[in-house]
Amino acid sequence: MNQVLSKIGQVKANIDISGASTARSASLLCELVELQLMHNPKYQLPQALMPFRQKIFSHYGQDGMLAEIFRRIGEDTQRFVDIGTAPAQNNSNLLLLKGWRGLWADAGIAKDETLPSSIQILQREGKLKICRKLVTRESCRTLLSSRGFAEDLDLLSIDTGYNTHHVFTELLAFRPRVFCVAYNGMLPADLDWAAPYDAKAVWDGSTLFGATLGTISAAAEAGGYSLVGCELSGTDAFFVRHDLLKGRFLRPGDAMFHWEPLRMHLGQMQRHRSAMPLPA
């Protein structure tokens, strides 16, 4: 706790004396807000995931939180599916760097020849497959199974924007060990709500997208998974299969406790541009 308070003081001092650009000042303010948020006593409780958040390739701190989840439950097949991804910023680049194999599924991924060299090498080595199709409730199972990713998954990460919840409920049957699912942090956890399904719909920037954390958590519990934490940004929730919980996580399934409101501004801190290193 004292370390957090000390860091807050350092950032405040940097803001006061920086005389830096507007972008740099905004970055420092975001860092200050993040540090103050992390001062919340519930994040200091034993088994809390929040202290482990770390951004390497993920949009926010998902990299570190996923790493801690797998530290607790262990890695098995080291296979993942990342639905709704971007090559430079996602929840799976760090896993690829650790030697995992997986599938990216997103209609917006650029053509192979325009992807970074490191990604092209992974494709040639058979460590990464790419599906450039719109992932819908009707197509998701076939898209994964036809590419050999219907079973034996350690992680299934889903963020399709508008229809995330509907794709998630369809893929519960695939039984990955861990789900990372985007939720609607604009709405409270105790509201039972999901966006009406529309296969062609995309998020328009409004509150009409996805589903509330409570709705997703209830579907997860019914499907054999428990909520174990949310990213501080209020964007992603983490679910672990019931047989793997074994007292390793703080208040599993408690959506009201784990809920975080949407804080997209936390992604504005200045960092090095994400790029996958070339294999050694």
Where do the language-model regions lie?
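A short alpha/beta connector and helix-capping loop motif
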Residues: 129, 166-202
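A structural signal for short, well-ordered beta-strand segments and their strand-loop junctions
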Residues: 82, 104, 157, 178-182, ...
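N-terminal auxiliary segments of SAM/dcSAM-dependent transferases
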Residues: 2-39
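Short glycine-/acidic-enriched loop or helix-start segments at secondary-structure transitions
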Residues: 91-92, 114, 167-169, 190-191, ...
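Short helix-to-loop capping/linker segments positioned immediately adjacent to catalytic or ligand/cofactor-binding
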Residues: 153, 167-168, 224-228
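SAM cofactor-binding core of SAM-dependent methyltransferases
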Residues: 50-151, 155-158, 162, 174, ...
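Short, well-ordered loop/turn elements at secondary-structure boundaries
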Residues: 97-99, 174-175, 221-223, 233
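Rossmann-like AdoMet/SAM-dependent catalytic core
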Residues: 24-74, 81, 140-144, 190-280
